[in-house]
UniProtKB/Swiss-Prot annotation:
Catalytic class of the enzyme: transferase
Binding sites annotated in the UniProt record for (6S)-5,6,7,8-tetrahydrofolate: S109, I110, L111, P112
Function: Attaches a formyl group to the free amino group of methionyl-tRNA(fMet). The formyl group appears to play a dual role in the initiator identity of N-formylmethionyl-tRNA by promoting its recognition by IF2 and preventing the misappropriation of this tRNA by the elongation apparatus.
NCBIfam families: fmt
Catalytic activity, reaction form: L-methionyl-tRNA(fMet) + (6R)-10-formyltetrahydrofolate = N-formyl-L-methionyl-tRNA(fMet) + (6S)-5,6,7,8-tetrahydrofolate + H(+)
EC number: 2.1.2.9
Domain of life: Bacteria
HAMAP family xrefs: Formyl_trans (MF_00182)
Protein name: Methionyl-tRNA formyltransferase
Disulphide linkage map: none
Pfam family, one: Formyl_trans_N
GO cellular component: cytosol
Length: 324
């Protein structure tokens, strides 16, 4: 079957590579325009564009899919089916009508849960234990089309969004190929999405990724993992922005005075106010609304990430120092 592949980030590469190795013919790749990247903000092609160029495929980078010249270019490809993996823009109705078998999208959730731009991040943020991937037929509305197939993936307690997305990209690629095979053979028909269990996963902005230390420890942990690596969880210290990597929960929490001299008994943790930092010999604790969390990595503005203990030694924190 003649395929048009639409995708942009690294996440789409396992699907593109698997389709290129299959019996199907990828006739062209559709991706987002070159975007500024790096410190110099120099425009760079997307990971999918680079992979397509290396494979000798034609690459289309339109700013608007609805432009007449873009629609004409899509028609000229004579693609029988278009497949989408994290393309990064809605496909308008005139484009949806071009391939004979329509457009199939690989979405990283079990639809109808977490429709939208950030399904993996929201699954972690809300404490889901299982997620997955879904192939479905694109419609004009957001992630509402009938479903071809699904695959499930457990969410591990220490998963970041990056970890989980990497696994889903691989398992989803196989699901996508199976879907394309089924459509090509005429043996796979989509079924309507369930009307119950609909939830939405809007894009998470840098503002959303700011840590609220007045939240419970479990929420701080989930937020940090949900926005790692992008956009990155952050806080401030003395007005300066600091990015934090995943944390561990410190259990249990006790008030001081557990021993006769007021010191802490082995394994006990002094109560900390939300955001308050306590530096110990082999760990750095921060208070939340419940139990403290143990910091993993710390990245001050303009510097590389480092272990929290190394950061604390160099920061020379005053007693009672607190993240805002």
């Amino acid at each position: 079957m003649r395929l048009l592949f639409a995708g942009t980030p690294q996440t789409a590469l396992p699907s593109l590579r698997l389709l290129l190795e299959s019996s199907h013919e990828v006739v062209a790749v559709l991706t987002r325009p070159d975007a500024p990247a790096g410190r110099g903000r120099t425009p760079r092609p997307s990971p999918v564009a680079l992979a397509a160029e290396q494979a000798g495929l034609p690459v289309l980078k339109p700013r608007r899919l609805a432009d007449p010249e873009t629609l004409a270019a899509l028609r000229s490809l004579n693609a029988e089916l278009a497949v989408v993996v994290a393309y990064g823009a809605l496909v308008p109705e005139p484009a949806l009508a071009i391939p004979r078998h329509g457009w199939v999208n690989l979405h990283f959730s079990i639809l109808p849960s977490w429709r939208g731009a950030a399904p993996v991040q929201h699954a972690i943020l809300h404490g889901d234990e299982v997620t997955g991937a879904t192939t479905f037929r694109l419609e004009p509305d957001l992630d509402t089309g009938p479903i071809y197939g699904t695959v499930t993936e457990p969410i591990r307690p220490d998963d970041t969004a990056g970890d989980l997305l990497n696994r889903l990209a691989r398992t989803g690629a196989r699901l996508l190929l199976d879907t394309v095979d089924g459509i090509a053979a005429g043996v796979l028909a989509p079924r309507p999405q369930p009307t119950e269990g609909v939830s939405y996963a809007p894009k998470i902005t840098p503002a959303d990724a700011r840590i609220s230390w007045s939240s419970p420890a479990f929420h701080v942990d989930r937020l940090i993992r949900a926005v790692t690596p992008e956009p990155g969880a952050w806080t401030t210290l003395a007005g300066r922005r600091i990015v934090l990597g995943p944390v561990r929960l410190a259990e249990p929490q006790h008030a001081p005075g557990a021993t006769d001299d007021g010191s802490l008994a082995p394994g006990e943790i002094r109560v900390l106010a939300p955001g308050e930092i306590r530096v110990e010999r082999d760990r750095v604790l921060v208070g939340t609304a419940t139990t403290p969390v143990i910091l993993g990595t710390v990245q001050p503005a303009g510097r590389r990430a480092m272990p929290a203990e190394a950061w604390a030694r160099g920061a020379r924190l005053a007693p009672g120092a607190r993240f805002e």
